[in-house]
């Protein structure tokens, strides 16, 4: 509720009915997300120069919301990967994507899903591109899915190794 109030206040309009409806929507949305998922992926788009990696750089309006920011000079500033997870941040940045690691402690509590997931210490990533840039969208999403798939394989491989070691000790 606090995040909803703060967001509506920044927009200049606080309406009790709107607050109630947003709370209902948020509760229903959270019910739809299984607890078992390892990472929630959100897909957003923005308009040219309205919301970008610069928003999170020192001097930007959301500079306190990020603990780390990687801005690639060859990428469009509007195309970003924002995450609550250090590993995902590092990997997306290593592939040259504008990347933002949300500061889960100091982030502005705006009621967004990234803030909620950060508070829960859960993995969340938002792939966001300028409206209409579907090729970039797909490329970033494909790379993210590859990263997550590699992690899954590594966990499975480690589990198999652990099982072999346990069996050989008997």
What is the predicted function of each stretch?
Residues 1-169:
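Structured catalytic-domain cores with a bias toward divalent-metal coordination
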């Amino acid at each position: 509720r606090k995040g909803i109030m703060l967001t509506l206040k920044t927009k200049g309009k606080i309406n009790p009915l709107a607050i109630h409806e947003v709370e209902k929507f948020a509760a229903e949305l959270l019910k739809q997300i299984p607890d078992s998922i390892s990472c929630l992926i959100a897909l957003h788009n923005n308009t040219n120069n309205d919301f970008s990696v610069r928003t999170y750089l020192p001097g930007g309006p959301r500079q306190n919301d990020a603990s780390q920011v990687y801005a690639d000079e060859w990428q469009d500033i509007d195309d970003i990967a924002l995450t609550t997870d250090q590993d995902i941040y590092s990997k997306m940045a290593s592939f040259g994507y504008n990347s933002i690691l949300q500061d889960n402690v100091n982030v502005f509590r705006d009621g967004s899903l990234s803030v909620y997931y950060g508070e829960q210490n859960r993995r969340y990533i938002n792939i966001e591109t300028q409206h209409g840039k579907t090729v970039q969208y797909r490329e970033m999403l494909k790379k993210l899915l590859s990263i997550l798939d590699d992690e899954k394989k590594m966990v499975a491989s480690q589990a198999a190794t652990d099982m072999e070691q346990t069996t050989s000790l008997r």
